[in-house]
Swiss-Prot record:
Biased composition annotated in UniProt, kind: Basic residues: 542-551
Phosphoserine: modified positions: 399
Pro residues compositional bias, start-end: 161-178, 438-475
Region of interest: Disordered: 1-599
Feature: compositional bias, Low complexity: 70-83, 257-268, 413-424, 504-531
Name of the molecule in the record: Gametogenetin
Domain of life where this protein originates: Eukaryota
Key words, A-Z: Cytoplasm, Cytoplasmic vesicle, Developmental protein, Differentiation, Nucleus, Phosphoprotein, Spermatogenesis
Amino acid sequence: MGNVQSEPSAGGGSRKEQASDRASDSRRTPLVEPEVTPSSPAMRLARGLGVWFPGSSGPPGLLIPPEPQASSSPLPLTLELPSPVTPPPEEAAAVSTPPPPPVGTLLPAPSKWRKPTGTSVPRIRGLLEASHRGQGDPPSLRPLPPLPRQLTEKDPVLRAPAPPPTPLEPRKQLPPAPSTCDPQPLSRRITLASSATSPTESQVRHSSEGQAAGGAHGGVPPQAGEGEMARSATSESGLSLLCKVTFKSGPHLSPTSASGPLAAKASPGAGGGGLFASSGAISYAEVLKQGPQPPGATRPLGEVPPGATRPLGEVPRAAQETEGGDGDGEGCSGPPSVPAPLARALPPPPYTTFPGSKPKFDWVSPPDGTERHFRFNGAVGGIGAPRRRTTTLSGPWGSPPPRSGQTHPSSGPRRPTPALLAPPMFIFPAPNNGEPVRPVPPSPQQIPPLPPPPPTPPATPPPAPPPTPQPPALPRTPILVARPPTPGPGHLESALAPTPPSTLSPTAAADQVPAATPATVTSQVPATATAELSPPMPQPKTRTRRNKGPRAARGVIREEGTSGDGPREPNTAPVTDSSSGGGGGGSNGTSTAGASNKGTARHWPPFEVLNSCPCKCYCRHQRRHRRLPRNVSAWLSTPTNHLSEPPWVATVKLAGSLVAGLEHYDLQATHST
């Protein structure tokens, strides 16, 4: 896994990848470390800067930077060979590959984290972990989760071996820290990842790398001790793996520093051994997010460098987990990238996580802001249902910080959406045309503009639930029957045509129904409708209502940002005419008769529009848009093909023609069979 990830990373050469590589290297090394020989420890120390844990999955390039030759090839191998204990000291040595020369190379990636010597290690660790998580690279990300689990499983094994390698006190210290720290799970994960890789390969690479590293790094007498220490820490706990990931920092770890936890060893000079990769638990994104925060880096296996950054590591890890893998969220598939322990302990619950894609959905977010408009405007299914779906996806979209706010806004609007959307979706009942629904409540849209007319008070009650209008509805049976939400429209219509049911009703229905469709409108309908119902004046009231209705619709449109009426018109051509003509007339103050006639004649409720087309057949005389494709029509009506071939033959041919995209196929031509 590490190898695969590392290769893509190597190509990219991104810091993330490098960090990932380091993390993987460090993890793997610990796995092998228990078996590492004293000489191997020395080599490892020599390589200390470039050491990477076997378990960590990251581009080998990152760790390798210290030793581009050895690290690039060996790193992948190491990644591939995750055997925790099998890797020989050579592997440890490879892990410790002297990164001083490569450090410069690595610096681009680790420099950030390495800047602080003390905190650098934890930070690098975090980076490694982050990369391991796959924050930086999707490839690493995906494999990482599995690796963490594996590491977790094998961690106990590593821990058991660790005690024997305890020869180095510092190493011993490191193991305790891992035990204490939450990062242990990370180390375990790393170990698992390491185990996943074949031990032999890992060992071979490590040995070759270790030897090379030993030669390169040789010159630090305490290297052997350091190596042992690293080995002990690694074996003791998956945590050591992180420790092992010594740093790639240019400065070699002095033996003294090596004595300290591996992280310390990697870094007094390495700046905390930016390479210090904690278990793959920390995602690159996470590390970056936490930035210089060494604790985040410390998150790794709980190694505590002499600086005692590790203790922070525990906290940072918890914090990161709490944040839901900030890095992860920030990165791309944050949740998946988070190591298994992190994922289990702290799912990135705030937002659903899509392993492959960014959680943010720009198309989803805007609805939040405009949700009302869209909902009201598109209450009809297209927008409403999708909106709800968006709600489902809402959590994942958007970055973690916004997720709280987003969630609430989404939540609020969405919750209303189901109730409001369902009713308003197709609230315009055909009955409204001829039959003025007497429900007194004015249309919701009318209600908002109610301010101009005396019924303005009802406008204030818009909060009233849409259900309220239903009770007031008098003879809006058609509307009521049409739909539960219909009551709202019914009220609107009744309000429009309380006195002139037939004349005003159509107009009201046309103008108000669209308005009613919006959830807001529906909500407003109850109080407004009731208020208007109370004062149903014959003509004056009618006019007022009529004016109100169109005005209300306009007002709603303005308020919603999407006109309840306007959007409806575009959505449904028939509605546009009725709304536009009737509603426009009403609002303009066109004679009630004119408005009513228009509305009555052509008020097509949005839901009705689909079925209301006068074209009842797909015959040849129909215009082109209504005609069926030649092949379909031929299939449906075959005057000459009655029984020449079994029906299934025609079906097969038709299916074939459709699949092939043929515009026409001859039913008779190929019936030879």
